[in-house]
Structures are given as C-alpha cells and as structure tokens.
C-alpha cells in the first residue's frame, strides 16, 4: 500500500506573477523532497502548470508533509487529494510520473 498526493494551487490564474509562484513552488518542493526523502517512494513533481504530486511510503504522514509545504509556500494556497492504495506499475523514485494504481485513483 502507498499514499498518493495530488495537489494544485488555488487561484493561480489570477496571480500577478505566475512565474514567481512557479519558482516558489519548485524550490519548496525541492526542499521538501530533501527533507522528507526517507518517506517518499517517488519525489514531489510538478506535473502540469501548477499541479504537483508525490507517492509516499506506507509509514509516511501525508498531513505532516502537506503542512510543511503549506507553511513554506506562505501566501500560495493549494488543495490536495490523498489516496491510499496499490501501485500497479513500476515506481520511478526521482519523479512521481507514470505510476498507476488505486493510490492515485483514490487521490483524484
């Protein structure tokens, strides 16, 4: 069993400086990946625009990690889906792309 997180920024289309927001998201997720590397099965990855996702190991605490991201993004708000389930494909550890299974289905 794994824990999938799928998130996106709220109201990003209305941001005055989308590039600055994207840079803040990227640097926050890179720092998060380093800080929580032992809990991640696949690193946080920006997928499309302002969406990001990760795959956590079963013992990880997704709420702790999401709270950390929220604190470090400061003024940027986001929403997340959390899914617990199986992964039926190979897991690429350095990015949360290409994986499939009920963990991601449930997070949507």
Name each model-derived stretch.
Residues 1-108:
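Regulatory and interdomain segments flanking nucleotide-handling catalytic cores
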